[in-house]
């Protein structure tokens, strides 16, 4: 049998919390068309992702990928920091 390569899901979002050790909370926003009215509405999802080196800060734009479950709520891992947050 030939090996079937599994596609890895990758998402981009903003870090909204970095208070946990080696874990970040990422807010993913998407636009969905309303089934009846046709208007595009913003929908959002919060995901917990593994950040091995604690390099992310609140406001950073990050890329995450799906992995095996790390804990009860964490099954995503940090791929890269796309854009650093502006410090004021």
From Swiss-Prot:
Highest taxon listed in the record's lineage: Bacteria
BP GO annotations: translation
This protein's record includes keyword RNA-binding: yes
UniProt family annotation: Belongs to the universal ribosomal protein uS17 family.
An annotated GO cellular component: cytosolic small ribosomal subunit
Gene3D superfamilies recorded: Nucleic acid-binding proteins (2.40.50.140)
Keywords on record: Ribonucleoprotein, Ribosomal protein, RNA-binding, rRNA-binding
Subunit structure comment from the entry: Part of the 30S ribosomal subunit.
Role according to the record: One of the primary rRNA binding proteins, it binds specifically to the 5'-end of 16S ribosomal RNA.
InterPro entries, per the entry: NA-bd_OB-fold, Ribosomal_uS17, Ribosomal_uS17_bact/chlr
High-level lineage: Bacteria, Pseudomonadati, Pseudomonadota, Gammaproteobacteria, Pseudomonadales
Protein name: Small ribosomal subunit protein uS17
A GO MF label: structural constituent of ribosome
